[in-house]
Amino acid sequence: MVVSEKSKILIIGGTGYIGKYLVETSAKSGHPTFVLIRESTLVNPEKSKLIDTFKSYGVTLLFGDISNQESLLKAIKQVDVVISTVGGQQFADQVNIIKAIKEAGNIKRFLPSEFGFDVDHAHAIEPAASLFALKVKIRRMIEAEGIPYTYVICNWFADFFLPNLGQLEAKTPPRDKVVIFGDGNPKAIYVKEEDIATYTMKAVDDPRTLNKTLHMRPPANILSFNEIVSLWEEKIGKTLEKLYLSEEDILHIVQEGPMPLRVNLAICHSVFVNGDSANFEIQPSTGVEATELYPKVKYTTVDEYYNKFV
C-alpha cells in the first residue's frame, strides 16, 4: 500500500489569532509547514516568542508580505496548499494571493480567510456587512479563476465568546446577572480553537472537501443563548438575573457606539437575532460537515468548556 505524502502547507497570517493554532496543528500532523512573515515581525516581542515556538515545531519561516507579489509567488511555488488567516483589514488583499496562485500553477488547494460564519448565508448589518461582502467577493473570484478551494466555517471561536458569555469587558462568566442578545432563542455554534485547527488539517488533503464548504457543527455545541445561560446556571447552582437586549437596542448601539464594539455587535445581531449561524441546511452539493466526516475527533463540548470556570 502506498502512503501518500502529506501536502506542504503555507500559512499566511500564521502569527494571528487562529493562524497560530493552524501552524501548530499542521506541523504536529506531519505536514511540511511554511509561514509567511514580515521581517518586522521578528522584532515584535510578543510575536518573536511565538516564532521561536514555531521553529521548535520545525516550521520553515519565509519572509514576505501579502502586498509584495514577488515574495508571495516565491513562497507559493514551494508548497501544495495555501491557507490564509489574515484579519479583516487584509481581506481585500487576498486578491494578491489569488493572482500568485494562478501564476504559480502548482497549488492543489486554497483555504481563504474564512474561519467564521458562512457569508453566503448571513444577513448582516453594517459595519459587519462590508466585511462579509469582502469575503463573498474573494469566494467568487476564487471560483471564477478555477482555483481548487475549501471554505472553512467554524462559527464562533469558543475562546472568544464563551469565557465571558458574551458580556462585554468581562473576563469570566457572569455570576449575578447576564445580558442576553435578542430573545435568546436562535441557535448558534461554538468550536474550540484547537478543534478548528484539527478539523481544518484533516480537510486539506481530503477529496471530500475539495471545492466545498466545510461546516463545523459539533452536535453538542449547537446551543441557543438561553441554553448556554441555563447550562452555566446549573454549573454554579445559581439563577442569574437576565437582561434582554432587544433588536432595537442592539441596532442603536451599532449605529452610535465605538468602532470595534459596532462590528462585534453587528455580528451578534446576525447570529443571535437573525440566527444566521445555524438556521440553514447544509447542501450536499456545496457543503460537508466536519463531525460527520471525522467522527473519531473528540471535540470539546460547551459543557466541558465551562468546567474550568466553576
UniProtKB/Swiss-Prot annotation:
GO terms for cellular component: cytoplasm. Involved in the biosynthesis of pyridine alkaloid natural products, leading mainly to the production of anabasine, anatabine, nicotine and nornicotine, effective deterrents against herbivores with antiparasitic and pesticide properties (neurotoxins); nornicotine serves as the precursor in the synthesis of the carcinogen compound N'-nitrosonornicotine (NNN). Reductase that may be involved in a late step of tobacco alkaloid biosynthesis. Maybe involved in either the formation of a nicotinic acid-derived precursor or the final condensation reaction of tobacco alkaloids. Its EC number is 1.3.1.-. Pathway: Alkaloid biosynthesis; nicotine biosynthesis. It comes from Nicotiana tabacum. Root cells silencing A622L exhibit inhibition of cell growth, severely decreased formation of several alkaloids, and accumulation of nicotinic acid beta-N-glucoside and N-methylpyrrolinium cation. It is found in: Cytoplasm. The keyword ATP-binding does not apply. Induction: Induced by methyl jasmonate in roots. GO terms for molecular function: oxidoreductase activity. This is Isoflavone reductase homolog A622-like. Monomer.
